[in-house]
């Protein structure tokens, strides 16, 4: 016997009803899963491994020192001391961190340690550190690899200190895949460990800008046998008025040192101070031009290199005091 189903048959209506019911059940199931997932992790921010969500955002750690405001996208550290075995603060989204009082982040991992990481795969994310307080990031125990802070685009508007250990492979203080801005008279201090392969205190793969009155102090420990870097800027380096840049590397055990390396223009603002020192490498290497403005002071010293400053372009002096031996392919131009 052959049953022919048409839109008017009872069997057809039953089958359609069953299919509609199954569709509704599947939709409800996925809706519940979706809601539960995003209720658990709606923001993409983790503090000491805890996903920040609407249930805990007002007191993430339970001690009143860390809280998040969804409306203005600000994660506040209020006299917080956080120790964690993995990445201490991880954000998949653009994030502002506000500092109140003295704050410290410590990653205790003995293999790979990182203090703050902002980013999601290949998507650039912005991280801003601000407020009237201060932040210290320490990676005391890692012996494989370490990174104090990594963010594609970083703005520092509060005092920041990063301390990384000696590592077998590599150690990085601050890594910016796109840009670095230091503003609001902030002081950034990086004490970077030594490594057998790669040691870099501050690495910026784009432009770096230091606003008026800001300070960067970057140092590396002795003992690196691979690449040893202080401040590396793959784009342009701009220093505003009355800024301070103090960079020193101990590259005595390697011939792959770069104390200050700028791929583009290096502009030193009026009244600013630059101090750079290395053992084997040139203290400053610039592959664009160096422009030192009125009343600035530029001091560079390399113990074992004939040139304290190497420049592929010209070194243009607009009334600054320069204390260094200079090798400039484009010459040294004094324009008082």
Give residue spans per PLM region.
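N-terminal Sec-pathway targeting helices
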Residues: 6-23
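A composition-driven surface/loop motif
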Residues: 14, 30-336
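Short, Lys/Arg-enriched N-terminal segments with co-localized hydrophobic residues
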Residues: 1-4
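Hydrophobic helical h-region of N-terminal Sec-dependent signal peptides
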Residues: 20-24, 28-32
């Amino acid at each position: 016997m052959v049953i022919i189903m048409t839109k008017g048959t009872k069997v057809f209506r039953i089958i359609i009803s069953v299919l509609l019911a199954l569709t509704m059940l599947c939709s409800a199931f996925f809706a519940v899963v979706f809601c539960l997932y995003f209720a658990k992790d709606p923001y993409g921010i983790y503090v000491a491994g805890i996903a920040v969500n609407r249930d805990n955002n007002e007191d993430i750690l339970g001690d009143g020192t860390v809280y998040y405001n969804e409306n203005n996208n600000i994660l506040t550290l209020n006299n917080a001391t956080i120790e964690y075995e993995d990445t201490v603060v991880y954000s998949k989204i653009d994030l502002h961190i506000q500092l109140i009082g003295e704050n410290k982040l410590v990653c205790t991992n003995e293999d790979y340690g990182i203090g703050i990481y902002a980013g999601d795969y290949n998507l650039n994310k912005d991280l801003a550190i601000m407020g009237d307080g201060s932040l210290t990031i320490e990676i005391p125990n890692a012996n494989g690899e370490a990174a104090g802070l990594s963010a594609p685009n970083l703005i520092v508007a509060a005092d920041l200190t990063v301390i990384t250990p000696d590592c077998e492979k590599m150690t990085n203080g601050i890594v910016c895949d796109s840009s670095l801005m230091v503003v609001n008279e902030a002081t950034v201090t990086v004490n970077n460990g030594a490594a057998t392969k790669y040691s870099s205190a501050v690495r910026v793969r784009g432009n770096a800008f230091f606003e008026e009155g800001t300070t960067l102090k970057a140092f590396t420990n002795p003992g690196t046998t691979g690449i040893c870097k202080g401040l590396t800027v793959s784009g342009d380096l701009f220093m505003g008025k009355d800024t301070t840049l103090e960079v020193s590397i101990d590259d005595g055990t390697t011939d792959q040192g770069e104390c200050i390396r700028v791929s583009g223009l290096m502009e030193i603002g009026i009244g600013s101070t630059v101090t750079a020192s290395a053992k084997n490498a040139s203290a400053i290497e610039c592959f664009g031009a160096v422009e030192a403005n009125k009343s600035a002071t530029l001091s560079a010293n390399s113990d074992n290199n004939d040139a304290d400053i190497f420049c592929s372009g010209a070194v243009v002096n607009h009334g600054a005091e320069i204390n260094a031996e200079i090798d400039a392919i484009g010459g040294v131009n004094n324009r008082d």
